[in-house]
Design a protein with these regions (language model features):
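Soluble non-transmembrane domains of integral membrane proteins
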Residues: 1-167
Length: 167
């Protein structure tokens, strides 16, 4: 049977470090959160020699029944930089590729209304003059993305179909 009343981590959850506690080039760290009911959530944080962070998530089901979870990710930017450039050669704001179509949305657009898109493949994020922060949904999994302003600028996605995790 499927248990849909599983406790999941929130922004208040306290994660613990498992194993190595120093993040360095090609030396990842693993954060864990145990829900106290037999399910352990893990986040592996990798840093490469070009300062690219890669965060992967995993769930261990130590219960006696299958569970279903809807994977999601979110990027939050608290405020727009004072020196935003908006040059035609460089986009600053929301960005994503949805089923091979590039979409760019300005901060002003998102402050006025949220933008929702669905796709089977792609990525989404927030970019600036010198950086990009992006999330990549599982390839081939239909997802809904939302760009919005609510207590900060947010780019997020959630898979439309749950992931089943067996014991």
């Amino acid at each position: 049977s499927i248990n849909n009343k599983i406790k999941v981590p929130t922004k208040e959850s306290i994660w613990t470090i498992s194993g190595n506690n120093i993040l360095s080039n090609n030396q990842p760290i693993i954060l864990e959160w145990n829900n106290g009911e037999g399910v352990i959530f893990k986040r592996k944080i990798d840093l490469d020699d070009k300062y690219l962070f890669k965060i992967s998530q995993r769930v261990e089901n130590n219960t006696n029944q299958s569970i279903e979870l809807y994977p999601y990710a979110q990027i939050t930017r608290n405020k727009v930089p004072d020196d935003i450039q908006n040059f035609y050669i460089s986009h600053e704001g929301f960005i994503g590729v949805f089923d091979e179509e590039l979409k760019e949305d300005d901060y002003d657009d998102i402050k006025d209304k949220k933008i929702v898109r669905e796709a089977d493949e792609g990525w989404l994020g927030i970019t600036d003059k010198f950086w990009v922060s992006a999330v990549v949904p599982t390839k081939g999994e239909n997802f809904k993305s939302t760009f919005l302003y609510k207590d900060g600028f947010k780019a997020n996605y959630i898979l439309n179909n749950p992931t089943k995790i067996n014991p």
